[in-house]
Structures are given as C-alpha cells and as structure tokens.
Swiss-Prot record:
The keyword Protein transport does not apply. This is Uncharacterized protein y4jF. GO terms for cellular component: plasma membrane. It holds the Pfam family Prok-E2_C. InterPro entries: Prok-E2_C, ThiF_NAD_FAD-bd, Ubiquitin-activating_enz. It is a multi-pass membrane protein. Keywords: Cell membrane, Membrane, Plasmid, Transmembrane, Transmembrane helix. It comes from the Bacteria.
C-alpha cells in the first residue's frame, strides 16, 4: 500500500484546517489508518445505496492509503469488486483489505450492523434526505435521487476525518445523528414528502467551472434519473495530477483530459444534450451570439470570475462555494429586490492585482513588476528568478530547476499550488490559496446540482439567499443565511442601465424567491 501520488495536494488542504501541522507527521498518521466501508444487499441493490457507496469510496480513496471494503452478505459481494476497482483507479497503490479487523473507523451503508470494534458511522438516505447515525443503521431509500445519498457520503467522510485528526481540530466533535433534507435544508425526523422520481427538463442551463465543485455537481447530475434539456459545460482547463485530491470524477486515466470533455463523458448515460465549451466564461460569452442565459450554475474559484458571470445578466444563478470555514449555495435573480451574485462579492477597498498576489506567494513581493511582465508575455521564467524563489522559500534550488524556461503561471501552479514547495519545506510553507478537503467541495457541488434541478422543475425556492454548512463541526441548527442586497448603491443590481438591459432580455417579471419554509 502507498499514499496517493497527489498526497502533497491533499496535505496542503489538511494543513489549512489542522493545528500544529507537520507534513511528515500527517503522512505517518495516514499510513497507520485502515478505514472501512461496510454494506449489505439493502444498500448494494438500490440506486441510493449504490450512490452513497460510490461517492464514499471516491472521497476516502483520495486521502487514506488503506481501505477495507466489507460486503456484509453474499448478495452484496459483487459491489465490493466494483468499489475496489474504483479505489484503484484513483490510487493504484492503495491497499485493499477484506477484513475489518484492523479498521480504525468505519462507514456503514444499509440495514445491517457489522461486528466491528471501531468508531462507526451509519450513513444512508431517503430521497432528498441525507442520514447519519452513530448508533443504528439508517438504510437507503428506494428513489432514484442522488442528493441525499451523496450528501450522506460527504457527512460520513467528514466525520471520519474529524475522528482521525480530532487532536488537531478545535470544536470538531462528531455528529451524533443527521437527518437533513437537501430539498428544504430543514432537519427532519419524518420522511421527506417532496417529489422524488420525476422527469426534469433543464431547458438551457450553463454549468460554469468544472473544478472540484463542478465535479460534485456533475457526479449528482449524472445519477439523476429523467433529466433532459441542454447543458452547456464551460471550463478552459485540463485535469492535472494535483486536481485528483478533490475532483471526485477524476482518476489517473483522466489526467490531461479537458475538463469540458470529461464532463461530457460523465453525462453520456443521461438524456441531456451536453455542449462542451473548453473556454473561459468571457470567451464563451463573446463567441455566443445569443446573450440569453436562462439558468447558470456557478462553480468558479474567484470573486472576479463570479462578478463576470453576473455581469452577463443571466435570468437566474445558483452559486456554490467553499471557503475557509464553510461551504454553501446561494440563489440569485436580478431584478427582484434580493441580493444578486455581485452583492455577495462586492469588493471593499482596493484589491491587489493578480501579479502582486503571486509575487507575494512566491516570497518575492518586490518583483511584482517582473511577475506582471512574465504573466502578460507568457515568457519562460529565467534561472535567476527561480533561484530567488528557492532562496525566499528556504528550499533547495535543484527540485525547482526543471521549471526554468516554463511560463510563470505553470511554475506557480505546480510549484506552489501543486504542493512542491509545501513538500520541500515539510509543510512549513503554507499555501495561501484556500484548498478545500474533497468532502467539502463534493457537498458544495451536490448542493449546486440540487438547486439547478429544483429550479428547473419549478419547485419553490428557499426563502433565504444562501445556505451554509461547516463540515469541520457538527451540523448546525441554523443553515439559512439571509444575505441582504447591497445597500451602498454601487452594485449593478442598483444601476438603471443594467436593470433596463435585464428587463429587455427577460421582461419585467421577476423570479419568486420564497415558499420553502426555513423553520
């Protein structure tokens, strides 16, 4: 068995949430763990249970070097083989155990209680509802919905992480139980009576950003029965090795693949008409003669990119994010008196330009003008520049020497964002950019997909603009966040020219925001 070949990126994410982090100690702690996934035929034979197991393995195999895959009856043994293949497609050197004797923690799907002497989390779902219990099996529902099932896997993986690294987490007690509807984000002990098996026409929908959150959304949409319509998937990048840390649909075979092409492949079993656009959003908009965007799912990394999407004036936007302390989803019309997407990301004060931020993260802020020139010209970084970075970072030059002559953005993404300097410094040189854990990005993506489907189906929307979840703490009792419309008058949703343009595109009718109870 061995840690995955992208473990340094996973370690970068962990370093941002764990106290007293040391790379060597972190890897040693992982190598001691055996994480079990146990299941019976009740889970293995239904769509919800299969979805829970699939995503649980996709999440766990990205971090832990040994998994115990444990079918609890003969009828479920066929599923074990598929899960083993899935785990090895992510980390070919992962250790697979067929006994739970050495397991430190276990996720259990189905209706059976395994005879294991370790911390156990029973996970499952019932339609829109995600379920977790510390004491009793929760089973898997009979619907074809993936949302509760996928969210349960994220809650389970988060509790596994909090169990193993409890000593380095503050306030990270374990969840005693969870019963949360992704339809309303209400906690409920009763069966969620919302529609579960129904055809949904997405109309013409855009999914912008096919990174970690986008992968979570694609995973869910690919498992949603009865979807039709046209889905535009927009992202200009290709999958890199470091992306495997949290891209739930990506394995070793997908490295180098266009993210837009991967999205098309993931959705090929659906009835969706998928159009891949391997472009930046601005390039896609410029090439598109029609600037009507009925529904846009936003899974982008930066505030600037989100502002650009809102600037194109889509009719309705669902926006998903991960940040240092939580993840979430926000919902936006424009001419409705509520917060638009720009209201959520309105800059205050003077923001630093990209070249200044990169120069600072390279440890040489005084060279920001040289960094600016290198970015603009796409010129290769000279030898003396790489030497200066190595000196500033306190790491040897030799491992960075292969980057001499490469474009600065490539050097920055691989050496800094990709975790090479982090590894060379034994984790002492932390990456400033927030790198979420895989279970955080996946849940944000599942929530995004759920919002797109609910909106397309005409289901009533949430009474609040946003919903937030912190997976590094027990699930909170108040998840709804009534984000107010920007009151400064600076936002485009207060600009008469933008309002007039929106009304010319879509008429004077506005999107209703509420109906689902937030209580």
């Amino acid at each position: 068995m061995a840690l995955a070949n992208f473990i340094d990126r996973a370690a970068t994410a962990a370093s941002q949430v764990l106290t007293d982090f040391h790379l060597g100690d972190f890897k040693a702690a992982l190598e001691k763990q055996v994480v079990a996934v146990a299941f019976d035929d009740q889970a293995a034979s239904c769509a919800e249970g299969q979805a829970t197991l699939d995503l649980a393995v996709r999440l766990l195999a990205r971090l832990y070097p040994v998994l115990a895959i444990l079918p609890l009856d003969s009828a479920s043994s066929f599923q074990a083989q598929a899960l083993e293949r899935l785990a090895k497609s992510i980390n070919p050197k992962i250790g697979i155990r067929r006994s739970g004797k050495s397991a430190m923690v276990c996720l259990v799907a189905g209706a059976t209680r395994p005879s294991l002497r370790c911390t156990t989390f029973f996970i499952g779902s019932d339609g829109w509802a995600a379920k977790l219990s510390r004491t009793d099996p929760v089973g898997s529902g009979s619907s074809l919905l993936p949302y509760g099932a996928g969210a349960a896997s994220c809650f389970g993986a988060a509790n596994v992480f909090r169990t193993i690294f409890a000593a380095q987490l503050t306030g990270a007690e374990l969840d005693p139980d969870i019963d949360l509807s992704l339809y309303s984000y209400n906690k409920t002990k009763a069966r969620d009576a919302r529609p579960v098996d129904l055809p949904v026409d997405l109309g013409e929908t855009h999914l912008v950003g096919l990174g970690a959150i986008g992968h979570g959304a694609l995973w869910a949409l690919a498992r949603q029965s009865g979807l039709s319509g046209r889905l535009h998937v927009v992202d200009h990048e290709a999958v890199e090795l470091s992306n495997l840390q949290r891209y739930v649909l990506a394995g070793q075979a997908e490295i180098g693949m266009s993210k837009a092409v991967l999205a098309t492949t993931a959705l090929r079993s659906t009835a969706l008409e998928v159009e891949a656009h391997p472009l930046k959003w601005a390039e896609h908009v410029a090439r598109r003669g029609d600037w009507i965007f009925d529904r846009v799912g936003v899974a982008l990394d930066t505030a600037a990119d989100r502002l650009a999407v809102q600037g194109a004036l889509p009719r309705w936007i669902a926006n998903a994010w991960t940040q240092e302390h939580d993840l979430g989803i926000s919902r936006h019309g424009f001419d409705d008196g509520q917060a638009c997407l720009c209201c959520m990301y309105m800059p205050s004060g003077k923001s630093k330009d990209e070249h200044q931020l990169i120069a600072e993260e390279l440890g040489i802020p005084e060279t920001h003008e040289q960094v600016k020139a290198l970015l603009q010209t796409n010129a290769g970084v000279p030898n003396d520049f790489v030497v200066r970075v190595a000196t500033a970072m306190g790491v040897p030059f030799e491992p960075l020497a292969p980057f001499v002559g490469q474009p600065l953005r490539s050097f920055y993404q691989q050496a800094i964002c990709g975790g090479l300097v982090f590894q060379l410094s034994d984790g002492s040189r932390l990456v400033r950019t927030v790198v979420p854990m895989a279970f955080q990005s996946a849940l944000a993506g599942i929530m995004l997909a759920a919002e797109l489907v609910k909106h397309s189906a005409g289901f009533p929307m949430s009474p609040t603009t946003s919903t937030r979840v912190n997976l590094l703490r027990p699930l909170g009792s108040h998840l709804h966040d009534p984000k107010a419309k920007d009151s400064s008058g600076r936002c485009i949703c207060s600009d008469e020219d933008f309002i007039s343009a929106y009304r010319r595109k879509y008429g004077n009718s506005v999107e209703p925001l509420s109906n689902i109870s937030a209580t």
